[in-house]
From Swiss-Prot:
Location(s) in or outside the cell: Cytoplasm
SUPFAM superfamilies: Isocitrate/Isopropylmalate dehydrogenase-like
Reaction catalysis annotation: D-threo-isocitrate + NADP(+) = 2-oxoglutarate + CO2 + NADPH
Transmembrane segments: none
GO cellular component, one term: mitochondrion
Assembly mode: Heterodimer.
Main subcellular location of this protein, as a coarse class: cytoplasm
Family of this protein: Belongs to the isocitrate and isopropylmalate dehydrogenases family.
Co-factor(s): Mg(2+); Mn(2+)
UniProt name for this protein: Isocitrate dehydrogenase [NADP]
Site (Critical for catalysis): 141, 214
Keyword NADP: yes
Amino acid sequence: MTFDKIKVENPIVEMDGDEMTRVIWKSIKDKLICPFLELDIKYFDLGLPHRDATDDKVTVESAEATQKYNVAIKCATITPDEARVKEFNLKSMWRSPNGTIRNILNGTVFREPIMCKNIPRLVPGWTKPICIGRHAFGDQYRATDTVIQGAGKLKLVFVPEGTDEKTEFEVYNFTGAGGVALSMYNTDESVRSFAEASMNMAYQKKWPLYLSTKNTILKKYDGRFKDIFQEVYEANWKSKYEEAGIWYEHRLIDDMAAYALKSEGGYVWACKNYDGDVQSDFLAQGFGSLGLMTSVLVCPDGKTIEAEAAHGTVTRHYRVHQKGGETSTNSIASIFAWTRGLAHRATLDNNERLLDFTEKLEAACIGAVESGKMTKDLALIIHGSKLSRDHYLNTEEFIDAVADELKARLLKAKA
């Protein structure tokens, strides 16, 4: 049966990806998006061969288009290492597309679990979601690192604009064979945007907000994060938070990691770039699976976002797929990349029909899993060593099951 397509007034940016996620991405579009929406898609192929062919210009162009149209939906992509350079015969070991996009958009990545009642959690005490906000600019991800050969002095030098009066810090006096060195940075402007985005997210959810740093060791670097967050809170959010019955608090990263493990959830955790990289995967596993995690990059303007799956390109499954074998790849996080991006488009455009559609598609995913229709990774969490083939669906069967569930929900709403 055909459905009246919902008209989406403004375009979205689509960033295609690699390997198995590229395969499921097309299936999601063909079965869950295009049959129901009249949608203007600005398409960018971020698959590794096309990034190589364009000298990675396509990645920059996709980020610039996101700034123009405010909504991007991204498939998982390969970040090449030495082995990938050989495999694809690349011109260069291109940077992480996520890193490039995040640095252009200068946003905060918020990750949150997709909770299904029948999927057991490794941390059973987590009865409420934990939303982790990762500052997606600077620190180790924009650092200059080097191998030091031999003895010598390592210095850090700052030369203020318009003057020759430089400030010099002696970092270390190397003796013997040498070692390694790293210089990294962040900006007040970016940290302030991170603070605003985190405060806003927690306020929308009516959850408390925690910022974690190691300001006892990095007194100036992490201390700056702590001070700026406090300034932003006092100036713009304190009265709103008190009214909503929520709070903001700074905690040391080690203390916060321990607290997270024993808490029940139900808060936003603002992390510096590296901490957020690590802790978001820790949270995903604790809640059940990286395949059950949403990931949205929120920009400082509050109206530009990029939604993506929180996992990689599922290379192992792709190798099986290439040989014509059966795969059972979890597409939920990729489906939620589409729903979260389209939901934001709906909010910006004041499109209630589109917003309702995204809610029904998310409910269809969760409904399918809770009715026992799931991919192998989720079935394994439930059945463990007793897992058999009839416990799970293959890649396409699962997307078909979600499509059936979605159609049933749309028809029910029509009736």
